[in-house]
Amino acid sequence: EFALPAIAGILLVPVVTDPKKAAAALNWAVNEMTQRYKFFAEESVKDLDSYNELMRANQEPDKVLPKIVIIIDELADLMMVAPSQVEESICRLAQLARAAGMHLIVATQRPSVDVVTGLIKANIPSRIAFSVSSQVDSRTILDVGGAEKLLGKGDMLYSPVGENKPLRIQGPYISDSETARIIDFVKKQGESTYDESVVQTIETPEKSQYGEVSDELTEDAIAFILKQKKA
């Protein structure tokens, strides 16, 4: 689904489709957020806008930092591969990244409790539910039923911060041809210039954290085998 945006000229890195590398990308985002807060502390500012304004005033445009939007198209794929790392990264970003100019959009077509965990949900206060198959799915997303009664085609329930109950609103239903025209327009504004250092970090994640990300129980299994003295 992100094949067209991949050429849109606005990406920091190519679209990441490998769940293992996506987990590493989230880890990079957490590290980037932490680094930005260090920059803010050094300059005695609180957020990205203040930092960038100061850098421009100091005639240091090369130190201006861009805003970053992190989009997870299917959370279930990541939670199958590295649930603990992904959950931790999402929670840290959701808690702290906004002031650093980093924003997180998480989507899934399988809103079960093992995908949208209680910890993730607690740290993402603003949520949207499109049409779902059951009241259970609606409650998993919004904490209330109702999304199972939506009509589709952009019909949604929006639960923003500060509202006691979800708002029913209509979002645009954009066809593939419309998407292609939008991407074509954005592409004409400039070609993508990827950050190779970020690409390299994602392509070769630290083995201590992600080298065996496909099996989180590897260490437990090794310990069990050593204890039983047989495999």
Spans of features found by a protein language model:
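P-loop NTPase switch/communication element
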Residues: 1-18, 25-27, 119
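P-loop NTPase motor-domain active sites and their immediate coupling elements
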Residues: 24-231
